[in-house]
Amino acid sequence: MTTLEAIKFDRTNVTLQILDQLLIPYSTEYLNIEGVDDAYDAIKSMQVRGAPAIAIVGSFAIVVEIKNRHISSIDELAAKIDYLESSRPTAVNLSNACNEIRALLGNSESLDEVYKRVFDFAVALYDDDLSNNHKIGSNGVDYLVESLRSQNFEGPFSIITYCNTGSLATSGHGTALGIVRSAYKALSKENSKEKFWLEQIYPCETRPYNQGAKLTTFELKYEKIPFTLICDNMVTSLISRTHNKKQVKDIVAPVKFAIVGADRIVQNGDTANKIGTFQLAAIFDSFNRRNTGPRDSLKMIVAAPRTTIDLKTTTGDDIIIEERPANELTTLKGPILRKDVAGEKQIVGVATPGIQVWNPAFDVTPHELIDSIVTEEKVYAKDKEGNYHL
């Protein structure tokens, strides 16, 4: 499969482009990132998003900043790094990358001295992320197979996804969606060597920014992985119908897993991710509490690289949650469609004007509601006391 390329960094000419994700799925256009200011704007406006991707873009932007000589001293560079880090505070990957670049500055007195160090760091960050995503995919598939075998499950099954965690959120392949990609390759009806097969993906729309509807469906369609889009508030009905062997759009494949990404995982396993993830986990927990046997059990899986794990923070109570502008909830922006042809972009209202709005970008799912955390190193499960050891 050929995956989408959200980040283009020319290592010879030292230029950076990103795919403008605000225009997807109706057009694919790349933006030039000339330095830190451009990267800050792109990250803040969510033209690029996803914890691994914003760390990579931020790091490459610092390289381009030095190369283009937008700054004249180490002190100016340090100030630019501080500014960049403030663009999205919840995602730990960007903060970690900025801290590592600060350490590379050391006692250097010239920009020429630090340029190669930062260049090498940014390139390694990109390459490692891509390699690690494939490992996450492989580890995730092993976990799916082990779980279904332990239940003596047979026949088709389906997976729920949330937000966007694929090539558009990383250097490529993806984290949670990377597991889906790897799973479909290994466990589609045509390829599966097991008594079960992956029949369908259900991406949640993911309000209010609709990354699931716009981005995840774009990736799944691009790679010809079968899917059916659902609204966030359809999850309970979907699980109930599929487990009662009722058709959903002519498909009978019980939901067995939700696979989500993470913007920050803290020491005890509490996980910050796109708003609504906690709700999804609570729904899974509710169904598991009332299921009639192990064959009916659902698994809530978090997929993320080790760089997303923040061992300095003890619990999710200490995670700073970014709040987004009210208009992202009260309006929608998109092109006017005429016979599926995209025309001029318009902003339309979907709520009463002048109202109070609360619009947090993330929530924190308690570790008690997470069945496993899949990384490039291993799959973490809780011990007998219900604790993670990350």
From Swiss-Prot:
EC assignment: the record states 5.3.1.23
| Name of a matching Pfam family | IF-2B
Q: In which pathway does it act?
A: Amino-acid biosynthesis; L-methionine biosynthesis via salvage pathway; L-methionine from S-methyl-5-thio-alpha-D-ribose 1-phosphate: step 1/6
Annotated site residues (Transition state stabilizer) in this chain: 163
State the InterPro entries in the record: IF-2B-related, IF-M1Pi, IF_2B-like_C, Initiation_fac_2B_a/b/d, M1Pi_N, NagB/RpiA_transferase-like
Gene Ontology CC, one term: cytoplasm
Location, primary (coarse class): cytoplasm
Catalytic activity annotation: 5-(methylsulfanyl)-alpha-D-ribose 1-phosphate = 5-(methylsulfanyl)-D-ribulose 1-phosphate
Class of the enzyme per the UniProt entry, highest EC level:
isomerase
- Which compartments is it annotated to reside in? Cytoplasm; Nucleus
Provide the GO biological process annotations. Answer: L-methionine salvage from methylthioadenosine
A single Gene Ontology molecular function, please? Answer: S-methyl-5-thioribose-1-phosphate isomerase activity
The active site is formed by 263 (proton donor)
Which of UniProt's keywords are assigned here? Amino-acid biosynthesis, Cytoplasm, Isomerase, Methionine biosynthesis, Nucleus
Q: Which NCBIfam families match?
A: eIF-2B_rel (TIGR00524), PRK05720.1 (NF004326), salvage_mtnA (TIGR00512)
Q: Which family does it belong to?
A: Belongs to the eIF-2B alpha/beta/delta subunits family. MtnA subfamily.
Name by which UniProt lists this protein: Methylthioribose-1-phosphate isomerase
Q: What is the lineage of its organism?
A: Eukaryota, Fungi, Dikarya, Ascomycota, Saccharomycotina
